[in-house]
Amino acid sequence: MYPNWGRYGGSSHYPPPPVPPPPPPVALPEASPGPGYSSSTAPAAPSSSGFMSFREQHLAQLQQLQQMHQKQMQCVLQPHHLPPPPLPPPPVMPGGGYGDWQPPPPPMPPPPGPALSYQKQQQYKHQMIHHQRDGPPGLVPMELESPPESPPVPPGSYMPPSQSYMPPPQPPPSYYPPSSAQPYLPPAQPSPSKPQLPPPPPSIPSGNKTTIQQEPLETGAKNKNAEQKQAAPEPDPSTMTPQEQQQYWYRQHLLSLQQRTKVHLPGHKKGLVTAKDVPEPIKEEAPVPATSQIAEPLAAEEPPLPPPNEEMPPPLPPEEPQNNSSEMSEDPEEDARLKQLQAAAAHWQQHQQHRVGFQYQGIMQRHTQLQQILQQYQQVIQHSPHIQTMSLDVQLRHYEMQQQQFQRLYQEWEREFQLWEEQLHSYPHKDQLEEYEKQWKSWQGHMRATQTYLQEKVTSFQAVKNQYMGNMAMPPPFVPYSQMPPPLPTMPPPVLPPSLPPPVMPPALPSTIPPPGMPPPVMPPSLPTSVPPPGMPPSLSSAVLPPPSLSSAGPPPVLPPPSLSGAPPVLPLPPLSSATPPPGIPPPGVPQGMPPQLTAPVPPASSSQNSQVPEKPRQALLPTPVSFGSTPPSPYHPPPQSEQGNSKPLNKVFSSEQGLGESSSALSQSVIAAKDTPVKSGGLLADPPKGSFLEGPRGPREQKEQLQKLKDFGSEPQTADHLPPPDSRLQNTSRPGMYPPPGSYRPPPPMGKPPGSIVRPSAPPARSCVPMTRPPVPIPPPPPPPPPPPPPPPVIKPKTSSVKQERWDEDSFFGLWDTNDDQGLNSEFKRDTAAIPSAPVLPPPPVHPSIPPPGPMPMGMPPMSKPPPVQHTVDYGHGRDMPTNKVEQIPYGERITLRPDPLPERSAFDADHAGQRDRYDRDRDREPYFDRQSNMTDHRDFKRDRETHRDRDRVLDYERDRFDRERRPRDDRNQSYRDKKDHSSSRRGGFDRPSYDRKSDRPPYEGPPMFGGERRTYPEERMPLPAPSLGHQPPPVPRVEKKPESKNVDDILKPPGRESRPERIVVIMRGLPGSGKTHVAKLIRDKEVEFGGPAPRVLSLDDYFIAEVEKEEKDPDSGKKVKKKVMEYEYEADMEETYRTSMFKTFKKTLDDGFFPFIILDAINDRVRHFDQFWSAAKTKGFEVYLAEMSADNQTCGKRNIHGRKLKEINKMAEHWEAAPRHMMRLDIRSLLQDAAIEEVEMEDFDANIEDQKEEKKDAEEEESELGYIPKSKWEMDTSEAKLDKLDGLRTGTKRKRDWEAIASRMEDYLQLPDDYETRASEPGKKRVRWADLEEKKDADRKRAIGFVVGQTDWEKITDESGHLAERALNRTKYI
């Protein structure tokens, strides 16, 4: 896994760093060792020779990255890592930061690993890790003998890699970061410091990396770095104390935000990067590696990973840039920016807001949980490296078991995801965590897509079982590749390449790669193919030779490998494949081999390479570039030039990122190389330029997919793919054919690189001629004989389709086969290689691969991806895998789409619309990556409609498409398509137009595009955005919600919500006159005060219309008329605008003063322009703005409004009412009105009680005045009794008698009396006699209780203890 990253994920480390470190040449010897070594050594060699090429690659990558940054914010992610650079060092997986890099070659070997046992790969991995720790990178290279095994980690078997990946990264969180760091480190290979630099913030570390890269020479440093890395990663989230974690996360968080601002990118990726560093990032990254691994074996599965990978890749690209920084001109900028970011990060850290820290920490911990699930997911999704070489039954069982395991994991994920979502929503600054949110949501879509994918995989295998059983025979070809296995590692390199390849490849390709020594041959073919030259020269000379050259020249490829971190010799290629085989290896790795293939010597190359490659890494059958070369070597070797071209294209891709011009030249060079290579087919070269390049990218991804598919189907697909590609594909413009072959090669990439990475690289390769070359070679090498299988190509497609085509169909096929397709794919590729416009062909690569492999990935993967446009399913995984790649944005389903586009059909389409394709490619290149992607989606749909064959090819494909379509409404697609078309037409004119130009078009998509997964979402959102056509509101773009976001007023005013509410709030009231705006404003103010807040400032436009008026009133006392000054509301329409302007000034001053954290704006605001300026001003000052819209029917408003506005006016206002922009948050004030209504009722009840109390008081007073209580009715029984008492002189508290309760309370008195007395008392209606003495006694008691009262006290009564006085009362006579 790491390897994948390293490049983009685990693997990425390898490619980027190598570029900068010239010392890597030392490593070169390792690569140098020989073909056998080639895999493992290749990494080393690649590092040295690759370093130069790496530099160039870095430059190219840098540009790509920059574009990616802007488009995907991946760069930002890197910056995030910057602070975590130490963490990155944790490339535990790599073993030692440096060692691992050295091992990159081993990672490359892992590709062979596919053949190799997964365990072996893992073994190797561990060894590598140990070596790295020890600091003997050499060791790893030495292990190269079984480099495939070691490489397994990266490509060997993506699965193993992921597993290793996961385990190596001791801390899961660090795990990812390490992968980031590690990948970078590997690039730094030369110096351990580099590993440190590799820290996730590739971009930021770029400067450091440069330095480090130079340092890399020291193994000790390496070890240290590795240790640091390990430590850092762990410290990252796991080791740190909660406080440290919080700071670390927060710092990264802020960093990403800052970077986003700087880059003016959605920042989506940035967030990811940060996330990466943080557990979340790890999660993403880990998933990515897993994906890569899975992708390699299981394209479909890979796709899931891609999302993380994409995220991962984004960071890697930055890292690559860092690596580039050492050798790239852009590096300086990157470095400067990184330094800025670092400084900013430090600053942010110091000024962290501790208040939200803990909440943030909780969210990050939840991220860790999700990441752990993703890590398990990676393990579940892993495939044995050789899964694709196994029988359909075995694969079917494998997927069925995987599906069961995944179901449990998926349920757990859903649970955790919901918890995380709840936590996030309660987080006050969740808008700052948009990147995380998008990332996890894209993962959510990814998990769902994986579920669907696994189901489809099982279904497709069952359906394909019969179809492909025949093709299974094809596996033999692959078997040769099996021998090629060594090359397989190459595949892994591709994995790595994704992250690093682009940068590494381009730089190394031109010159560094040559250093290995192969360069001469490769280099001659094409500048970029410096690396290829090592392997290429032979390939050029003869198909066979190239492969060996590759394997033996592995070192040269190695250079690329560093970038690719794939099979050493092959690896170099892989890097190329990832990065566009910087060296001769057509980035895919197959490219190098392919050139030979291209050459007539397909078979020879195959044998040669096989023999040679086998030596190195048998493991990587397809993956190894050599293996590629071997199977497709013959064809590919001719492609060597092509590849060289490819590598150049890679450079181009990078350069394309850097500058279209360069990519263009690279393209032409690659084309020229192809022409030189014509051996394979002029068509290849000729077509390639147009489609081949385009296809190339596709090819790589597809290749990978195909490889995987072949593995899945036993290589049978490869044969089909290969054969057809050479013939029909080449004819097709090589776009379909060629790429498909690459596709077959592609499979290798899957190994190490996530499909995404491959995809991405694939785009670059497309740029490079490799795709062209590849098309000829296609996967045919093994199937060279099977050329007859031209039909198979379609089949292959299906086969691939099951795995690769799924994605390719949508992703690569669209661009590859159709002009539209091209456009779709190309659009992606072009976006990546915006610079590559010159070579529309290149665009195809971008189509899908590029998308997936944002910058670097394309490089590593492109070679692979290129040839295999055919790959359907695999790419599905790739797309996902390439978190960086736009592909990821394509819904899982789409990518997975098995429906294979018949290569022929595509090619036919291409041929028909070659011109159009070129134009499309150009547009695509011009278009921003994302736009292209969106376009691609549309194209895909379009293509689908147009090409029934595809659907007919596979019902599964169709279903997948349907799934994709559902995921992404066609509307979205169409819209994006339309947008793209418009843009493309404008773009057409300026081929050179940087992708940045397109940015504006993409804004809506931008956020999501970063995460491929979101892409689908964005388009949907985007559609809605247009809807919010409150024309005014371009601002809506920020929150392009289908439904405007709404917040309940209780969540802001009442606890517990008010604890987590934004610190500064503005509420804008809007509604018709009389709708209750002022009333609600007062309610809000009162509520705020009620819960302990300061009284909000209420700014009302009505206040401006209140004037002082003199009124004549009658003085009630004198009856005279008196003039009084009164404040009255007088509406003056003429003054409204003036008053509004005045109020706006007041509002701004209030914002600036900062005395009022809560401001309420009370005005009609019937037009958006009336309140839009307020909204903007408040937002600028950091206020959260809520829109409270009052609703009431016109009649009610007419009656209620206190300002005398007429119903006519109100109706007119309502008719011309403007809806608020969607991006403005709504405030739901219904609960406030309900509370107010309830309170009113309560008040009434309360009033009633008060009245009762008043009544009682009055009664008491009356009693005191001896007027008696106020009777309810004169004749009530009570009354008579009361009167009797009065007559008897026994006045008692009448108040008590008032109700029966009072009477009951007096029962005690009655109980003391004789029965006769009680009886008589019970006859209130009759006059009766009372016991005067008893009554007198009671009266005395009462008086005693009252005490002395002036003027009333009867001392006799009070002092009469014995009762004599009372007895005397019996003698008194009373007259009644």
From Swiss-Prot:
GO cellular component: nuclear speck; nucleus
Positions with biased composition (Basic residues): 261-271
Classification lineage: Eukaryota, Metazoa, Chordata, Craniata, Vertebrata
Task of the protein: Plays a role in the reduction of telomerase activity during differentiation of embryonic stem cells by binding to the core promoter of TERT and controlling its down-regulation.
Subunit (UniProt): Interacts with PPP1CA and NCOA5. Forms a complex with ILF2, ILF3, KHDRBS1, RBMX, NCOA5 and PPP1CA.
Tissue: High level expression seen in the brain, adipose tissue, heart and kidney, with a low level expression in muscle, spleen and lung (at protein level).
GO molecular function, one term: DNA-binding transcription repressor activity, RNA polymerase II-specific
Record-listed N6-methyllysine modification sites: K675
Pfam families, sorted: AAA_33
Cross-link Glycyl lysine isopeptide (Lys-Gly) (interchain with G-Cter in SUMO2), sequence positions: K886, K943
InterPro entries, sorted: P-loop_NTPase, YLP_motif_con_p1
Domain of life of the source: Eukaryota
Biased composition, class Basic and acidic residues, residue ranges: 277-286, 698-714, 896-930, 937-1004, 1013-1023, 1039-1058
Bias (Low complexity): 31-50, 59-80
Any single biological process term in GO: negative regulation of transcription by RNA polymerase II
Organism: Rattus norvegicus
Compositionally biased tracts (Polar residues): 207-216, 238-260, 642-671
Comp. bias regions, Pro residues: 14-27, 81-93, 102-114, 148-158, 166-176, 184-204, 303-320, 511-537, 545-594, 632-641, 738-753, 773-796, 840-870
Gene, per the UniProt record: Ylpm1
Record's subcellular location: Nucleus; Nucleus speckle
Segments of this protein annotated with the region Disordered: 1-335, 511-1058
Keyword tags: Isopeptide bond, Methylation, Nucleus, Repressor, Transcription, Transcription regulation, Ubl conjugation
Name of the molecule in the record: YLP motif-containing protein 1
Sequence segments annotated as region (Involved in interaction with PPP1CA): 1326-1333
KW Transport (keyword) present: no
